[in-house]
Amino acid sequence: EPPIEDFDITLLGTDESFNGDVIARKVLESEAILVASPEYLRRRGAPQQPQDLMQHDCLRLKMPHMRPRMWQMWCPDNPTQPIEIDIQPVLLANHTDSLLRAALDGAGITSVAMDMVAPYLTRGELVRVLAPWITGRLSMYAAVPTRKFMPQRTRVFLDFLIEETRLQTAKALQACATC
């Protein structure tokens, strides 16, 4: 974990809970969905069920705590029971923007936070794959060193950050009503 006490605000991205001793406010919550370019889907066809991903070009985020050759997926009908799909990624990257760019270029199917990809879906540059399945829930928290002595400028910025993020996320998702 980053040295939270060294900064006024530390942004922590997580797909799980974190240390309960951390003083933090949730800034953002999103679901990760699978997307591909229309060109890729014309060329390879769209998967009809999660197991079909084994036959597709998958673009996968590589993180220390993740198994890169497997996607966990949840269906809204059974949100507590994920399924695990073995995949053979054609691209492993440690940066979401690289995977998004590769998907836009027709390289394959990737998992991206819904609010991040909503503008591309709205413009038709990407298409959601295997809806309503999701590949995870992501949260971002703003951690502060202490609640007692938070400077007013920090409190004002934190309130602004949370409200602006909420508005931008709502705007992105509203623009993409079919997400």
Predicted regions and their residues:
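Short beta-strand/turn micro-motifs at beta-sheet edges
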Residues: 22-23, 128-131
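Alpha-helical segments flanking ligand/cofactor-binding loops in enzyme cores
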Residues: 25, 51, 100-101, 155
